């Protein structure tokens, strides 16, 4: 990351020192359980900000130490991994809940509740089915709006009604055809 001026470097280092002093005045125990009420993205944003401050401070310290000594100091990897550790329990716990041993058994048993159509809705659906066994998309949309149902519910009802008609043809409503 390139900085536009030395002033911006100094602002970052002084702001990180101020934040370090604030953190030192309110020490938190190292075994503190992470707050699960905040979202994962918020945690990642906080960690990215801490990492940027840490990297800026480390590069600033390295630039000063390289001017005083011929060898540059290398920051150990453990200093960076300590920034990542608070998020790992969030991710692990989420995955543990999602992919637990018995989750697949419970997932197979979960079903949407059966839609209970009102008598008015059934009369209208049966009337439409007697006119035409297949609905066009615009007609399905219009019928869904009229009956306060979703298009998917209308589509599934028509599929089920066609299968019922196929199994027992006597269930088809008699179409009244007038001869003139």
Swiss-Prot record:
InterPro entries cross-referenced by the UniProt entry: HD, HD_metazoa, Homeobox_CS, Homeodomain-like_sf, MNX1/Ceh-12
- SMART domains in the record, alphabetically? HOX (SM00389)
Q: Spell out the protein name for this chain.
A: Homeobox protein ceh-12
Q: What is its main location?
A: nucleus
Q: Where in the cell is it found?
A: Nucleus
Q: Which GO terms describe its biological process?
A: negative regulation of gene expression; neuron fate specification
Instruction: State the function annotated in the UniProt record.
Output: Transcription factor. Plays a role, downstream from homeobox protein unc-4 and Wnt signaling, in specifying synaptic inputs to A-class motor neurons. Involved in patterning of the synaptic outputs of the postmitotic DA class cholinergic motor neurons.
One cellular component (GO) term of this entry = nucleus
Q: Does the keyword Nucleus apply?
A: yes
Keyword Phosphoprotein on entry = no
Q: Name one GO molecular function term.
A: DNA-binding transcription factor activity, RNA polymerase II-specific
Which Pfam families does the protein's record reference? Answer: Homeodomain
Q: Which PROSITE patterns match?
A: HOMEOBOX_1, HOMEOBOX_2
Tell me the keywords, alphabetical order: Developmental protein, DNA-binding, Homeobox, Nucleus
């Amino acid at each position: 990351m390139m900085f536009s001026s030395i002033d911006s470097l100094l602002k970052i280092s002084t702001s990180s020192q101020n934040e370090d002093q604030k953190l030192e005045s309110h020490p938190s125990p190292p075994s503190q359980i992470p707050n699960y009420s905040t979202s994962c993205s918020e945690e990642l944003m906080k960690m990215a900000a801490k990492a940027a401050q840490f990297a800026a401070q480390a590069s600033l310290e390295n630039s000063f130490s390289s001017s005083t000594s011929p060898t540059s100091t290398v920051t150990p990897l453990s200093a960076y991994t300590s920034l990542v550790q608070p998020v790992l329990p969030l991710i692990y716990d989420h995955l543990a809940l999602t992919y637990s041993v018995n989750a697949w058994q419970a997932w197979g048993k979960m079903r949407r509740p059966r839609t209970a159509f009102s008598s008015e809705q059934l009369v209208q659906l049966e009337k439409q089915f007697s006119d035409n066994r297949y609905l066009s998309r615009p007609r399905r949309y219009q019928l869904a709006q009229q009956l306060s149902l979703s298009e998917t519910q209308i589509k599934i009802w028509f599929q089920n009604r066609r299968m019922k008609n196929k199994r027992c043809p006597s269930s088809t409503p008699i179409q009244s055809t007038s001869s003139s």
